[in-house]
Curated annotation (Swiss-Prot):
<dbReference type="GO" id="GO:0006412">
    <property type="term" value="P:translation"/>
</dbReference>
<keyword id="KW-0687">Ribonucleoprotein</keyword>
<comment type="similarity">
    <text>Belongs to the universal ribosomal protein uS19 family.</text>
</comment>
<dbReference type="GO" id="GO:0000028">
    <property type="term" value="P:ribosomal small subunit assembly"/>
</dbReference>
<keyword id="KW-0689">Ribosomal protein</keyword>
<dbReference type="GO" id="GO:0015935">
    <property type="term" value="C:small ribosomal subunit"/>
</dbReference>
<dbReference type="GO" id="GO:0019843">
    <property type="term" value="F:rRNA binding"/>
</dbReference>
<comment type="function">
    <text>Protein S19 forms a complex with S13 that binds strongly to the 16S ribosomal RNA.</text>
</comment>
<dbReference type="InterPro" id="IPR020934">
    <property type="entry name" value="Ribosomal_uS19_CS"/>
</dbReference>
<dbReference type="InterPro" id="IPR005732">
    <property type="entry name" value="Ribosomal_uS19_bac-type"/>
</dbReference>
<dbReference type="Pfam" id="PF00203">
    <property type="entry name" value="Ribosomal_S19"/>
</dbReference>
<keyword id="KW-0699">rRNA-binding</keyword>
<protein>
    <recommendedName>
        <fullName>Small ribosomal subunit protein uS19</fullName>
    </recommendedName>
</protein>
<dbReference type="GO" id="GO:0005737">
    <property type="term" value="C:cytoplasm"/>
</dbReference>
<dbReference type="InterPro" id="IPR023575">
    <property type="entry name" value="Ribosomal_uS19_SF"/>
</dbReference>
<dbReference type="InterPro" id="IPR002222">
    <property type="entry name" value="Ribosomal_uS19"/>
</dbReference>
<dbReference type="GO" id="GO:0003735">
    <property type="term" value="F:structural constituent of ribosome"/>
</dbReference>
Length: 91
């Protein structure tokens, strides 16, 4: 269920401060974060945010279509390697 409009979007304060500094300095270095729960705001567009997926930081280049989504949606935590092949079918 989506968050109430009267509450507004959630973003961790430490990430918000890093984003504001990067926008102010026009810095294009990736911002490293573990906050997958934070929502993407309009002033993040154009920034690269390295989102942790449990093993490494995945770089996510934010564009206009991503606004309103959570950062964790763009860094997959599970890798699907496919089902085991049937040995009889290979022959």
């Amino acid at each position: 269920m989506p968050r109430s409009l009267k509450k507004g979007p959630f973003i961790d304060l430490h990430l918000l401060k890093k984003v504001e500094v990067a926008v102010e300095k026009n810095d294009r270095k990736p911002i490293k974060t573990w906050s997958r729960r934070s929502m993407i705001l309009p002033h993040m567009v154009g920034l690269t945010i390295a989102v942790h997926n449990g093993r490494q930081h995945v770089p996510v280049l934010v564009n206009e279509d991503m606004v309103g989504h959570k950062l964790g949606e763009f860094a997959a935590t599970r890798t699907y390697r496919g089902h085991a092949a049937d040995k009889k079918a290979k022959r």
